[in-house]
Amino acid sequence: MPAKVLDGKKIAADYRANLAQEVEQLKAQGVTPNLTVILVGNDGASQSYVNNKKKSAEKIGMSSSIIHLDESTTEAALLEEIDKLNNDDNVHGILVQVPLPKQIDETKVLEKIAPEKDVDGFNPINIGRLYAGVETYIPCTPLGIMEILKHADIDLEGKDVAVIGRSHIVGQPVAKLLTDANATVTLLHSRSKDMDAVLKRSDVIVSAVGKPGLVTKDVVKQGAVIVDVGNTVVDGKLTGDVVYDEVSEVAGAITPVPGGVGPLTITMVLNNTLLAAKRAQQ
């Protein structure tokens, strides 16, 4: 029996419908949640991502602005722009689109965004709060993965979960969230030994490496849930880490690429922006 397809577009659409209702309730109280995105330079993919975020926010009733700065913008000028947004009570969520030009230190930029407006969850203070188990903003892709897993008909408690990739954006935070859900988590990376053995016993595999063909049918146990966060362009086509067609034959449930995790990532940006607007009223 082929795997259940975990349709990120459908899950995201349902989630956004609920967000839209909450946005309307907040607007009735005189507060319109605002997401402001800063784009430095003219990278085509980045422009597309930024426009998508703006449209998605406006579609559920939020306001959204794009601040487009020149490629030659200095680090000091960008930090000054962020400072203005930090002090603007009408702005609830601030995103700075990466990658940034080489003259700008990304770490300094993330540190500059006020933690209470850091809807990406990348400010070191918010990362620390996540691991301390206190109120914070959870990075959007890990949050989206957890939402997808709710639709996979699996109780994570006590399950063996393999997370491939240890980035601060996906791998490490999703491992923390899965641990909080009482799963037994193994975090795998390029130096891991016996990766195949770990994958073969895993009830859930989350792959977030960006290496097409990494997860094949022979390392997936029958009925396992597969979440593919890979996002690599091969011959003009978006491709995940998982060999989808063959793994679908043995998996119990699987996310496609595209149309799996991606739609949930932007949805969780909206979720965190709404949360920031609510917290600002408290």
From Swiss-Prot:
Molecular function in Gene Ontology: methenyltetrahydrofolate cyclohydrolase activity; methylenetetrahydrofolate dehydrogenase (NADP+) activity
Family stated for the protein in its record: Belongs to the tetrahydrofolate dehydrogenase/cyclohydrolase family.
Catalysed reaction, written as an equation: (6R)-5,10-methylene-5,6,7,8-tetrahydrofolate + NADP(+) = (6R)-5,10-methenyltetrahydrofolate + NADPH; (6R)-5,10-methenyltetrahydrofolate + H2O = (6R)-10-formyltetrahydrofolate + H(+)
Organism from which the protein derives: Macrococcus caseolyticus (strain JCSC5402)
KW Amino-acid biosynthesis (keyword) present: yes
Record protein name field: Bifunctional protein FolD
Matching NCBIfam families: PRK14175.1
Pathway: One-carbon metabolism; tetrahydrofolate interconversion
Subunit: Homodimer.
Keyword list, A-Z: Amino-acid biosynthesis, Histidine biosynthesis, Hydrolase, Methionine biosynthesis, Multifunctional enzyme, NADP, One-carbon metabolism, Oxidoreductase, Purine biosynthesis
EC assignment: 1.5.1.5, 3.5.4.9
Function in brief: Catalyzes the oxidation of 5,10-methylenetetrahydrofolate to 5,10-methenyltetrahydrofolate and then the hydrolysis of 5,10-methenyltetrahydrofolate to 10-formyltetrahydrofolate.
Residues at which NADP(+) binds: 165-167, 190
Organism domain of life: Bacteria
GO biological process: L-histidine biosynthetic process; methionine biosynthetic process; purine nucleotide biosynthetic process; tetrahydrofolate interconversion
Keyword Kinase assigned: no
A cellular-component GO term for this protein: cytosol
